[in-house]
Amino acid sequence: MVHFTAEEKSTILSVWGKVNVEEAGGEALGRLLVVYPWTQRFFDNFGNLSSPSAIMGNPKVKAHGKKVLTSFGEAVKNMDNLKGAFAKLSELHCDKLHVDPENFKLLGNAMVIILATHFGKEFTPDVQAAWQKLVSGVATALAHKYH
């Protein structure tokens, strides 16, 4: 279980309140699919994923990215119980979708990069550390069903 200090929680909540979920979600998922092309196999029904520009402009990537980041809001609300908050998603990704749990870490890292680009100098090393801790905790929670 991940333990967050009051300061880390405050930092995460402060940034999350300013996140454009639709924009950042599409960018994070798009970046995952471009940087780690083998992840595209989980999205074969998304249509054209043939190039970085096709991926980043794909409406299905944007829509699913928004869905992913919206569910990530549950992590922000449930920092003290990530495993419980993601139990159903863990089961779905393990039992039905058969997603390699390493991909959760990759998506989390892509999300941190997107937050850094969106918030610039405001995304200090302390802010990044809090967010890395959260995305790592979410990745672990999503991988829970695999163990």
From Swiss-Prot:
Superkingdom to which the source organism belongs: Eukaryota
Family: Belongs to the globin family.
PANTHER family linked to this entry: HEMOGLOBIN FAMILY MEMBER, HEMOGLOBIN SUBUNIT EPSILON
Record's GO cellular component terms: blood microparticle; haptoglobin-hemoglobin complex; hemoglobin complex
GO biological process: hydrogen peroxide catabolic process
Cited function: The epsilon chain is a beta-type chain of early mammalian embryonic hemoglobin.
Entry-linked InterPro entries: Globin, Globin-like_sf, Globin/Proto, Hemoglobin_b, Hemoglobin_oxygen_transport
Domain Globin: 3-147
Keywords from the UniProt entry: Heme, Iron, Metal-binding, Oxygen transport, Phosphoprotein, Transport
CDD domains cross-referenced by the UniProt entry: Hb-beta-like
Phosphoserine modification, residue list: 14, 51
Known partners and oligomeric status: Heterotetramer of two alpha chains and two epsilon chains in early embryonic hemoglobin Gower-2; two zeta chains and two epsilon chains in early embryonic hemoglobin Gower-1.
Record bears the keyword Heme: yes
Gene Ontology MF, one: organic acid binding
Name the record gives this protein: Hemoglobin subunit epsilon
Binding residue positions for heme b: 64, 93
Tissue: Red blood cells.
